[in-house]
Swiss-Prot record:
SUPFAM superfamilies: Triosephosphate isomerase (TIM). The N-terminus is blocked. The keyword Secreted does not apply. GO terms for molecular function: extracellular matrix protein binding; triose-phosphate isomerase activity. Homodimer. Substrate binds at N10, K12. It comes from Paracoccidioides lutzii (strain ATCC MYA-826 / Pb01) (Paracoccidioides brasiliensis). Its EC number is 5.3.1.1. This is Triosephosphate isomerase. Pathway: Carbohydrate biosynthesis; gluconeogenesis; Carbohydrate degradation; glycolysis; D-glyceraldehyde 3-phosphate from glycerone phosphate: step 1/1. Induction: Preferentially expressed in yeast cells, the host parasitic phase. Disulfide bonds: none annotated. Belongs to the triosephosphate isomerase family.
C-alpha cells in the first residue's frame, strides 16, 4: 500500500486569533487533495481555536510537549492536557528547540516516548547543520538522532511517528536541499528504518521534508520516491500553502 502523502504546517511563534482564523477558513474552503493528510501546528495559545475551526480534513498539532505528567513544570504542556483538548499530534525535536533551547537527542526521545504513550502522534524532526553537511556528517547526524529515539520507542510504536528531515541550513533561509540531496537523505532514513526497526516500518513510515518548501519547489521534491510530504514553515501562513498541499495533483 502506498504511503499517504502528509503535509504539516508549522506556524511557529506567528499569528493572532484573527490571522489564524483567516488561514483556517481559507483551508476549509479550498479544494484540497483528498489523498493528503494535513496537520497544522499553531502556537499553543491558539490550539483550541484551531481545533474548533478546522474541518475534518485538517488535524491540529502542538509544537511542543513535555516529557513528564502534569506537575510543577512552569510554562510546559503535558500530553494529558493536549489530549484533554482533543489535540492528536505534536512536534518533537524541531531544530529551533534543539539549537535555541538546547534540547538534546535524549530529551527529544523522551518527549517522543511520552507523547506516544499518551496516545499522540508525533512529527519527529531531525536534521544537520551547515557545518555538519560540509563535513560530510549528514547521515551520521540524522542516524544518531534516530538512534536516540529508538532507545525509547519500541518497534511496534513507530507507526505513530512521521519523520521530518529538516536540514537546519535550509530552515527559513531561502536555501533548499536539491531534490537529489533530499532523496539521498530520505533513502538513508528508510535504510535505517529497515535495519534498526523493521522492513515493515521502512515500507510504511512516512519521511517528509522541511526547509524552505514553497509552491515553486514542492512538486519536484514530491516526485522523489522517498519524499512522502512536507513540514512547511513560513509558507504555511500564506495562500501558497494550498499549492504545497496539492503538490501531487
Amino acid at each position: 500500500m502506498p504511503r499517504k502523502f502528509f503535509v504539516g504546517g508549522n506556524f511557529k511563534m506567528n499569528g493572532t486569533a484573527k490571522s489564524i482564523t483567516h488561514i483556517i477558513t481559507n483551508l476549509n474552503s479550498a479544494k484540497l487533495d483528498p489523498s493528503t493528510e494535513i496537520v497544522i501546528a499553531p502556537p499553543a495559545i491558539y490550539l483550541v481555536l484551531a481545533r474548533q475551526l478546522a474541518n475534518g480534513q485538517v488535524a491540529v498539532s502542538a509544537q511542543n510537549v513535555f516529557d513528564k505528567p502534569n506537575g510543577a513544570f512552569t510554562g510546559e504542556l503535558s500530553v494529558e492536557q493536549l489530549r484533554d483538548e482533543k489535540i492528536t499530534w505534536t512536534l518533537a525535536g524541531h531544530s529551533e528547540r534543539r539549537v535555541l533551547l538546547r534540547e538534546d537527542d535524549e530529551f527529544v526521545a523522551r518527549k517522543t516516548k511520552a507523547a506516544i504513550n499518551g496516545g499522540l502522534n508525533v512529527i519527529l524532526c531531525i536534521g544537520e547543520s551547515l557545518e555538519e553537511r560540509e563535513a560530510g556528517k549528514t547521515i551520521d547526524v540524522v542516524t544518531r538522532q534516530l538512534d536516540a529515539v529508538a532507545e525509547e520507542v519500541s518497534p511496534a510504536e513507530w507507526n505513530k511517528v512521521v519523520i521530518a528531515y529538516e536540514p537546519i541550513w535550509a530552515i527559513g533561509t531561502g536555501k533548499v536541499a536539491t531534490t537529489e540531496q533530499a532523496q539521498e537523505v530520505h533513502a538513508s532514513i528508510r535504510k535505517w528504518l529497515n535495519e534498526k526497526i523493521s522492513p515493515e516500518a521502512a515500507e510504511n513510515i512516512r519521511v517528509i521534508y522541511g526547509g524552505s518548501v514553497t509552491e515553486n519547489n514542492c512538486r519536484d521534491l514530491a516526485a522523489q520516491p522517498d519524499v512522502d510530504g512536507f513540514l512547511v514553515g513560513g509558507a504555511s501562513l500564506k495562500p501558497a500553502f494550498v499549492d504545497i498541499i496539492n503538490a501531487r495533483l
